[in-house]
Swiss-Prot record:
Top enzyme class: hydrolase
Full protein name: Histidine biosynthesis bifunctional protein hisIE, chloroplastic
Principal location class: plastid
Stretches the record annotates as Phosphoribosyl-AMP cyclohydrolase: 51-178
Keyword line: Amino-acid biosynthesis, ATP-binding, Chloroplast, Histidine biosynthesis, Hydrolase, Multifunctional enzyme, Nucleotide-binding, Plastid, Transit peptide
Phosphoribosyl-ATP pyrophosphohydrolase: region residues: 179-281
Catalyzed chemical reaction(s): 1-(5-phospho-beta-D-ribosyl)-ATP + H2O = 1-(5-phospho-beta-D-ribosyl)-5'-AMP + diphosphate + H(+); 1-(5-phospho-beta-D-ribosyl)-5'-AMP + H2O = 1-(5-phospho-beta-D-ribosyl)-5-[(5-phospho-beta-D-ribosylamino)methylideneamino]imidazole-4-carboxamide
Gene: HISN2
Length: 281
């Protein structure tokens, strides 16, 4: 079972006391009140830091004081990179909300993005059941790999075993994003003249009326699985059709599935009524 540090990280973010420049108070009463407020904030920070220290004490660090840390995209599920952390690196990540690691070669902390500005913004931190490995769950500002690839994992072992090196770099994608990648390739191919019968995806990409009519048709068939009390197995089948055709429309519009999932994530803590009121008209 994984343990989340999200609540603690949010508390630290809210409680930090940042003073942009020194304050001078001519009013003695005002100065007195401000001292009480700052002291209160200091006490809260001390209490929160004590919680952080307690959590860090429970991590099973190796004989060098390190643990493996894996960064994962909160929206796509893609594994971005893997590094090592010590107590200070994990503590810094929790407080700064930026993925921070420990460099074994330089024996120093480093924050992903400190030179490239491709930071990984941390939304949560998880520790595995044995408390000896960590997941940084967040959103990347850009490519994570120093090669410019989206993630550091783009070499398929099975492709190499099958001598299929012609396929080139291939990101480790989940089913949903593998489908998005295929649709994207079909979109690129649709600009090139083709002999013979085009694929169904290509037809949809080149015919807006057909695409929209299929989305409406498949959505209606999905609803009928409920209204007509069809076999339960029909529901995921029809939903797959809706999702596929909707993703073709997204590709046509230049919208990534990641953008959709980001919208959903941001709605988790917001009611539907509030969301509608805040929509840009």
């Amino acid at each position: 079972m994984a343990v989340s540090y999200n609540a603690l990280a949010q508390s630290l973010a809210r409680s930090s006391c940042f003073i942009p420049k020194p304050y001078s108070f001519r009013d003695t009463k005002l100065r007195s009140r401000s001292n009480v407020v700052f002291a209160c904030n200091d006490n809260k920070n001390i209490a929160l830091q004590a919680k952080v220290d307690n959590l860090l004490d429970r991590i099973k660090w190796d004989d060098k004081g390190l643990a493996v840390a894996i960064a994962q995209n909160v929206d796509t599920g893609a594994v971005l990179m893997q590094g090592f952390v010590n107590r200070e690196a994990l503590s810094t990540t929790i407080s700064s909300r930026k993925a921070t690691f420990f460099s074994r070669s330089r024996s120093t902390l480093w924050t992903k993005g400190e030179t490239s500005n491709n930071f990984i913004n941390i939304l949560d931190v998880y520790v595995d059941c044995d408390r000896d490995s960590i997941i940084y769950l967040g959103t990347p500002d850009g490519p994570t790999c120093h090669t410019g690839e989206e993630t550091c994992y783009y070499t398929s072992v099975f492709d190499q075993l099958n001598n299929d090196e012609a396929s080139g770099n291939k990101l480790a994608l989940t089913t949903l994003y593998s489908l998005e990648s295929i649709i994207s390739k079909r979109k690129e191919e649709s600009t090139v003249p083709q002999e013979g019968k085009p694929s169904w995806t290509r037809r949809l990409l080149t015919d807006d009326a057909l695409l929209c009519s299929k989305i409406r048709e498949e959505a209606d068939e999905l609803c009928r699985t409920l209204e007509d009390n069809e076999e339960v197995s029909r529901t995921p089948s029809e939903m797959a059709d809706v999702l596929y055709h909707a993703m073709v429309l997204l590709s046509k519009r230049g919208v990534k599935m990641e953008d959709v999932l980001e919208v959903l994530r941001k709605r988790f803590s917001q009611s539907g009524i509030e969301e509608k009121q805040n929509r840009t008209k």
